[in-house]
Amino acid sequence: MLVCVFVALYTMMGLLTDIKQLQSDFDDEMFEFRAITKDTWQRIVTKHTYPGGVDEETIESHPPTFETLFGTRKARQAYPEQCNCGPKSEGCPAGPPGPPGEGGQSGEPGHDGDDGKPGAPGVIVAITHDIPGGCIKCPPGRPGPRGPSGLVGPAGPAGDQGRHGPPGPTGGQGGPGEQGDAGRPGAAGRPGPPGPRGEPGTEYRPGQAGRAGPPGPRGPPGPEGNPGGAGEDGNQGPVGHPGVPGRPGIPGKSGTCGEHGGPGEPGPDAGYCPCPGRSYKA
């Protein structure tokens, strides 16, 4: 149980740390976003207020604002010639500088500014570095040390086929080659002339007959013969021994009932006393 509590606490601490880091990253990103939007808006207002361009000192002394933007529009519409807001001439030389204005009152010293935040990513700097008022262009630094050798690149495509070179000098006589394959058989030659007549051969007479040899092995059985005719009936055989008694048969059906018999003869006296007479008449 205690281990589970420690694990839960450790997990919660990790989650809180991640949330805190996420909030810090979000604040940094929002600061960069506000700085970029503020700078972009400043450039848009400056470009609209001073279409012909202006130096940075004028922008710093009289920074354009949202009210200046709409005030300039009204002045252009009301007094286009006095404010010199009409179409700008092209190719005209600059006029003489005007008289210096009255000296203004000295402003109060400003408070020390807060420490600056980290700069914008390099991609944003690369996009806005040509706009006036952007980052300071620093001279390139010294070249860094030589880096390590890169990996071997993939093999290049196959080159064009080279030209045929000049024929080489004639070589010396080579050694004997290996034995070739056997040739095809030649054509049959002509028949030769008949040979000389041979000497007469020895004549032999037939000898006496030899003894009979042992009998040969038994041959295979012959084919089956045709079926024979029906034989004659044989004599009657003797009477066989009596068989074993069979099982008792099923009881037969009951016969018809006989006729009633007549009255039997009186039996002998058993020695009993005579029966008493009846006391009433039927």
From Swiss-Prot:
Regions of compositional bias (Pro residues) in chain numbering: 214-224
Compositional bias (Low complexity) spans?
A: 235-244
Quote the cellular component terms of the Gene Ontology held in the record. Answer: collagen trimer
GO molecular function (one): structural constituent of cuticle
Q: What ranges does the record give for the region Triple-helical region, renumbered to this chain?
A: 95-124, 141-269
Region feature Disordered, mapped onto this chain: 86-282
Record's subunit section: Collagen polypeptide chains are complexed within the cuticle by disulfide bonds and other types of covalent cross-links.
Which family does the similarity line name?
A: Belongs to the cuticular collagen family.
Name of protein: Cuticle collagen 8
**Source species, please?**
Caenorhabditis elegans
